[in-house]
């Protein structure tokens, strides 16, 4: 069912790690669109099994007669950055380089990633544990665009167990990631301890959790549309919001347009505490001499005459 609903722009790149999920995705895509699929493998070099993953990918692609493009990256994390974030950033940069290189034929238009319903539930639970808003509760999108490519996750409504069951029926081998059982990682603890408990209490939890994330994503889209409309109304030609125009909005609508302005103009997101303080200062701004200077992200929002500006010192 998931593959029947999947209609990517072709040619298609498939992100292939060598694990069960990406192995299944490549086999399914290669069978459906022969001659239109390219496998993309990123070797992070972060674990001893990296060479085994790459070897499996080479053998699988040879058996399927699917072209394989490989990128070796330095995914070591910087200070203040999680290993997962560093690996993800390096991986997407590599995907873009592999897909868009002028020497690569065919020219890839879409990239499919094999994250599934269990991954989506884990992402949603992590967002809930952080007290995330709608962007976090939307979890992972089914489809998005980045760097001139369309990315897709066709397995987001399919359980990991169903994928492995299908691979078993096909008698296809894959490589087990040795880090998946390391409970020092939060995702692995969720997978090993929380998901089985949810399965016992609520057997349909994958479907309902994924549906909730979809509802949150739709609500976030509406807030984005409203934010764009309000930003056009409250911001001058210079793109900075006018304080009096902000004061005329309800507090919820004001918070939304401030988030929209900061994210789209500067790529920063205020914390809940920072946003509340900023709104309190906007409400109190009734005299010419009232000063606003609040830290947001790596910079500051400040009052400049009748408007707000953000700067990074």
Residue ranges and their predicted role:
Residues 155, 182, 197-204, 245-250, ...:
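A general boundary/transition motif marking the beginning of the first structured unit of a protein
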Residues 102-118, 208-226:
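Electropositive, surface-exposed helix/loop patches at the edges of structured domains
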Residues 1-20, 33-44, 73-77, 90, ...:
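AMP-forming adenylation/ATP pyrophosphatase catalytic core
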Residues 164-214, 218-221, 299, 306, ...:
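Mid-to-C-terminal catalytic subdomains of enzymes
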Residues 130, 134, 160, 199-203, ...:
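Alpha-helix boundary/capping and short turn/kink residues
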Residues 1-192, 196:
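Core alpha/beta nucleotide-donor-binding catalytic domains of modification enzymes
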Residues 111, 156-157, 198-199, 283-286, ...:
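Short secondary-structure boundary micro-motifs
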